[in-house]
Structure formats: structure tokens, C-alpha cells
Amino acid sequence: MQVEGFEFPDELYYYPEEHVWVKIEGDMVTVGITSLGQYMAGKIFQVTTKNKGEKVTPKSVIFTLESAKWIGKFRLPVEGEIVDINDEVVKNPTLINEKPYDAWIVKIKGDIKKEKLLPVSEAVKIFENDAKRVIR
């Protein structure tokens, strides 16, 4: 789905407060930043994640992104363990700006609070409001 010129794939779930996309596969989730989220951040030059094997809770900072104008700490409604980190994105963070839905950041195995995530059809109003605020 397109929202104000930004792509939001229908098959993903979203945590709109953090501008995070989530792909759910059984008890595994793959996590990245939305196209609008990367636009709002600007050119991303650093990605820092928890280590593989570390436990996470909904209060844990799972990863941090840095751009020239912003530092963002990301949390998710998930309890589990980091099972994979996209080393390519950590080494070359601008991949998030170039292809945000290919440039996943971490994979987590555990209990995702799916009721806290939204399909794009339910998140569209939030994304529309945020996009209108940042597009000039």
C-alpha cells in the first residue's frame, strides 16, 4: 500500500509508534524500519543492536539508529532472544535508506504481542498523519 508516497507492504505488520515493520513467521520475527521511518531519520550512518543470544523484553532497547539529525532507540512488544543480526546492514547502514524492506535489522525468536502490532490497513491513518507532518 502507498501512503503519501511511502510504501508499506501489505503482508507485514507495523508498530507505528516506532515506525518499525515486523514480518512474523511462527515464533520468529524479522524487524526493520519503514520507508517513512527512514525518511524521517535522514541518512542513517550507524546501526547498533543487542548481541545475538541476548534476551529482549518489551522494555528492552533492541537496536539504535543514528543519523546526522537524530538518534533513535527502538523497542518492540516482544519477549524472546535475538537469533540473527543483519551484519550487512550494520556495516552499511545506508542500505536502510535505499531499501528499507530488504534491509532487516534483527530476527527475534519468542513471544510477539501481536495485538500491539497493526496491519497496514489499521496503521494507515497514523502513517498519513506522520507523513503529512514531515513532507514539505
From Swiss-Prot:
Cofactor(s) for this UniProt protein: (R)-lipoate
One cellular component term from this protein's GO annotations in UniProt: glycine cleavage complex
Domain Lipoyl-binding: 28-109
Keywords: Lipoyl
Pfam families given in the database record: GCV_H
Protein name: Probable glycine cleavage system H protein 3
Co-factor remark: Binds 1 lipoyl cofactor covalently.
BP term (GO), one: glycine decarboxylation via glycine cleavage system
Modified-residue entries (N6-lipoyllysine), positions: K69
Family assignment from sequence similarity: Belongs to the GcvH family.
CDD domains hit by this protein: GCS_H
Function: The glycine cleavage system catalyzes the degradation of glycine. The H protein shuttles the methylamine group of glycine from the P protein to the T protein.
Summary of subunit composition and partner proteins: The glycine cleavage system is composed of four proteins: P, T, L and H.
